[in-house]
Amino acid sequence: MTALNVLIYPDDHLKVVCEPVTKVNDAIRKIVDDMFDTMYQEKGIGLAAPQVDILQRIITIDVEGDKQNQFVLINPEILASEGETGIEEGCLSIPGFRALVPRKEKVTVRALDRDGKEFTLDADGLLAICIQHEIDHLNGILFVDYLSPLKRQRIKEKLIKYKKQIAKS
């Protein structure tokens, strides 16, 4: 297993609508394993494939961070949602920034697991928020897209400067 490089906003690949996975095979399972490694190394609770420059509809989630309740969602689709909630969200692709994002309190999602078997998951609380955040990534949407243009531009400018500093070191 290998940790992958996380793309930083405003990388254009973060704005791409990802393609569905056509077949879950060993190559896809390797991607899933590498995504979990990356997510834990970066101290995240969720990761979408486009964040590591893989433009396929794959999500890994572990809101507890203990490797006991891992979720793999391949080709996820929200079937139902209800309630209103929101928390200050962060994102591995937008380091150092957080913002309040409106989300649904509960979601029902259908997806494939790491073996290609279809399942349905009812989620609420942080898990529901994380699922929505990561599905947004698969659709080329970042949490900054929920912010005002001015706030989004300020974050973009700061992260461009941050990326230049990293490139120099």
From Swiss-Prot:
One of its GO terms (molecular function) is metal ion binding. Keywords: Hydrolase, Iron, Metal-binding, Protein biosynthesis. Gene3D superfamilies: Peptide deformylase (3.90.45.10). Binds 1 Fe(2+) ion. Pfam families: Pep_deformylase. InterPro entries: Peptide_deformylase (IPR023635), Peptide_deformylase_sf (IPR036821). The keyword ATP-binding does not apply. Its EC number is 3.5.1.88. Its cofactor is Fe(2+). GO terms for biological process: co-translational protein modification; translation. The active site is at E134. CDD domains: Pep_deformylase (cd00487). Transmembrane segments: none annotated. Fe cation binds at C91, H133, H137. It catalyses: N-terminal N-formyl-L-methionyl-[peptide] + H2O = N-terminal L-methionyl-[peptide] + formate. The keyword Ion transport does not apply. Belongs to the polypeptide deformylase family. Removes the formyl group from the N-terminal Met of newly synthesized proteins. Requires at least a dipeptide for an efficient rate of reaction. N-terminal L-methionine is a prerequisite for activity but the enzyme has broad specificity at other positions. This is Peptide deformylase. It comes from Haemophilus influenzae (strain ATCC 51907 / DSM 11121 / KW20 / Rd). The lineage of its organism: Bacteria, Pseudomonadati, Pseudomonadota, Gammaproteobacteria, Pasteurellales. The gene is def.
